[in-house]
Amino acid sequence: MTDDIKRTTLLVRDGDRAAEWYEQVFGMARWMDTPFTLSGEQLAAGKKGDQTRLIILKANHDLIGMIGLLEWLDPKMEAPDELPTEIKFGAPIFVVASQDARGALERARGLGSRIHCEPREWSVTGADGKVKDMIGCSFWDLDGYFFEVNQTVKVHD
């Protein structure tokens, strides 16, 4: 038996602003948006009674590849003054298969994201042994999560 990792939930400062970023940059859609009170047991953040809001966004599937945005409403969760400028141990790297890597980067830039790497052409040998020509770029979202965005341009036989 193999389990599916269906969602990654991110702590965000402003749920609406974060959701709009994912909707505009990657074309994701809101799947769920609900307030809830923490039990103080299962989640290793906050404490019992904290009022939060969970927004879940989906791309092409409603079982895998979803992103949750968790905002503390009361009390507000303290956020760092400065967002990361490099990836540290323990921080996730989100890898996106995009139909338009250049467009995603420009949309992210327009919404205020910090850009790490402008679109560049590169090649990789896939698990099937075929060489794939790619366009890749990378940037941070508005809460400091890092995204590597890749677009397959051509698969060689």
For each feature predicted by the language model, list its residue ranges.
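Vicinal oxygen chelate
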Residues: M1, T9-L10, D33, I67-G68, ...
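Exposed loop/turn and edge beta-strand positions of beta-sandwich/beta-sheet ligand-binding modules
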Residues: D4, D50-Q51, G90, D133
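Residue-level detector of short, conserved catalytic/binding motifs and their immediate flanks
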Residues: K6, I55, P92
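Core segments of cupin and vicinal oxygen chelate
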Residues: L11-I64, G110, K130, K154
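A cross-kingdom feature marking solvent-exposed beta-strand/loop segments within repeated
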Residues: P35-Q42, M77-P80, R120-D128
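Short, charged/polar surface micro-motifs in flexible loops or helix N-caps
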Residues: D62-I64, P75, A101
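Glycan-recognition patch characteristic of GH18 chitinases/ENGases
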Residues: L83-P84
